[in-house]
């Protein structure tokens, strides 16, 4: 079965998670715990699910995006006895009903991506929140929502911001998104990147990864930003930086990666050249103003799989993957080796919650640094890389304020 083959391929290259899985089989740290998950249901995620099951957990899972599930992987999970409610192409009601089904499993620990599951536990399904010992959140967008909830004092349980771990955002967000977003654009369009003007909206870790990889493929990259420091970084990194109003006039391919809404609006679309391509690498489909495109269009059609052509009368523009995550809808998401670290963090976060939930407050926490650094060490070991250690004299030097000129 294709789904099982995909999972086995991912397992082969997820060596850090594999080591943790071996440890979990012996220790069974999640024995007696139910884990409710909303993640992109594809092969790498399935390896995490298997790891949690080997740790003793009961698992219920659904997708965190209506379009990102790979049905053959979801089928493989169900065939393995996992309560999996995900399917590709859900409408909004089906999507939320699947989330409700996960919550009805009465999870002790929640693993979320985008915070939709956690949000439901603070709304219509809040009666189930009492049983939740803690949660972890995978992505920047979700952490932004959760920190807002913490500020307002409404969080009902502690949350570990796995996204904020160094071994997550420095690698997953930058190298993972950088490669997979470009992969999604290329798979959807079959067009050449070299010589194109690629406009990257946002210069956070995701945006800088996309900009880096687009330049590496020969594109001329323009960055748009609202943050002065990030804009200055982009300039110093050698990219052109300008307002979206100006970039709209020259761009061939636009990729949004901001975690905010209305980045590409009607006034920008009107300025674009014929054949402009719009793609989104942010979690939700709100970065490109799709309702504006629908209003402006005289006609629309499917030009290719994952490519919608909008005829605006004087020109055509192309929207990829319905404005959803282009890397997961039109491609396979992040590279396996990158998700090895991200999901190692998730597995360790679940264990940490199981062992420490009684000590944690209703706050958003970073993953403990010792776990973060352990993942880095394990990754280096899996790659055959050795590094130096500080000598005793060096340790003393770094801690002694008396040492000077």
From Swiss-Prot:
Gene3D superfamilies: Adenosylhomocysteinase-like (3.40.50.1480), NAD(P)-binding Rossmann-like Domain (3.40.50.720)
Any one Gene Ontology molecular-function term assigned to this protein's record: adenosylhomocysteinase activity
Reaction(s) catalysed (UniProt annotation): S-adenosyl-L-homocysteine + H2O = L-homocysteine + adenosine
GO CC terms: cytosol
PROSITE patterns: ADOHCYASE_1 (PS00738), ADOHCYASE_2 (PS00739)
Cofactor notes: Binds 1 NAD(+) per subunit.
Names of required cofactors: NAD(+)
InterPro entries registered for this protein in UniProt: Adenosylhomocyst_ase-like_sf (IPR042172), Adenosylhomocysteinase-like (IPR000043), Ado_hCys_hydrolase_NAD-bd (IPR015878), NAD(P)-bd_dom_sf (IPR036291), S-Ado-L-homoCys_hydrolase_CS (IPR020082)
Pathway terms, separated by semicolons: Amino-acid biosynthesis; L-homocysteine biosynthesis; L-homocysteine from S-adenosyl-L-homocysteine: step 1/1
Domain of life: Archaea
Keyword annotations: Cytoplasm, Hydrolase, NAD, One-carbon metabolism
Entry EC no(s): 3.13.2.1
Binding-site residues for substrate, renumbered to this chain: 113, 138, 168, 172
UniProt xrefs under CDD domains: SAHH
Subcellular location(s) of the protein: Cytoplasm
UniProt: NAD(+) binding residues: 139-141, 173, 202-207, 225, 260, 281-283, 327
UniProt-listed SMART domains: AdoHcyase, AdoHcyase_NAD
One of the GO biological process terms: one-carbon metabolic process
Family label: Belongs to the adenosylhomocysteinase family.
NCBIfam families, alphabetized: ahcY (TIGR00936), PRK05476.2-3 (NF004005)
Role description: May play a key role in the regulation of the intracellular concentration of adenosylhomocysteine.
Protein name, entry field: Adenosylhomocysteinase
């Amino acid at each position: 079965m294709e789904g099982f083959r995909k999972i086995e391929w991912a397992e082969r290259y997820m060596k850090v998670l594999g080591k943790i899985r071996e440890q979990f089989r012996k220790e069974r740290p999640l024995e007696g715990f139910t884990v409710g998950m909303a993640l992109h249901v594809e092969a790498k995620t399935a390896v995490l699910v298997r790891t949690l099951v080997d740790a003793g957990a009961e698992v219920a899972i659904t997708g965190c995006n209506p379009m990102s599930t790979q049905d053959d992987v979801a089928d493989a999970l169900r065939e393995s006895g996992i309560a999996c409610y995900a399917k590709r192409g859900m409408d909004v009601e089906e999507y939320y009903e699947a989330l409700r089904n996960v919550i009805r499993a009465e999870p002790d620990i929640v693993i979320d991506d985008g915070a939709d599951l956690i949000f439901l536990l603070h709304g219509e399904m809040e009666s189930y929140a009492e049983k939740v010992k803690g949660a972890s959140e995978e992505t920047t967008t979700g952490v932004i929502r959760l920190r807002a909830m913490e500020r307002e004092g409404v969080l009902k349980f502690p949350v570990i911001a796995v996204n904020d771990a160094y071994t997550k955002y420095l690698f997953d967000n930058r190298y993972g998104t950088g490669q997979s977003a470009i992969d999604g654009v290329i798979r959807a369009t079959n067009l050449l990147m070299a010589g194109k003007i690629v406009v990257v909206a946002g210069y956070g870790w995701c945006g800088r990864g996309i900009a880096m990889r687009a330049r590496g493929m020969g594109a001329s990259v323009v960055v748009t930003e609202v943050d002065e420091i990030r804009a200055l970084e982009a300039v110093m990194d050698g990219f052109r930086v300008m307002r979206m109003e100006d970039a709209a006039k020259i761009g061939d391919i636009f990729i949004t990666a901001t975690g905010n809404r209305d980045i590409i609006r009607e006034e920008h679309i009107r300025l674009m050249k014929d054949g402009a391509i719009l793609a989104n690498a942010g979690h939700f489909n709100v970065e490109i103003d799709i309702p504006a495109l629908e209003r402006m269009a005289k006609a629309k059609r499917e030009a290719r799989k994952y490519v919608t052509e909008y005829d605006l009368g004087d020109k055509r523009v192309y929207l990829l993957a319905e404005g959803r995550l282009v890397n997961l809808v039109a491609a396979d998401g992040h590279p396996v080796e990158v998700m090895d670290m991200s999901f190692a963090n998730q597995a360790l976060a679940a264990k940490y919650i199981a062992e420490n939930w009684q000590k944690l407050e209703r706050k958003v926490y970073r993953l403990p640094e010792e776990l973060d650094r352990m993942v880095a060490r394990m990754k280096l070991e899996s790659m055959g890389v050795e590094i130096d250690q500080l000598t005793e004299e060096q340790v003393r030097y770094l801690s002694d304020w008396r040492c000077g000129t």
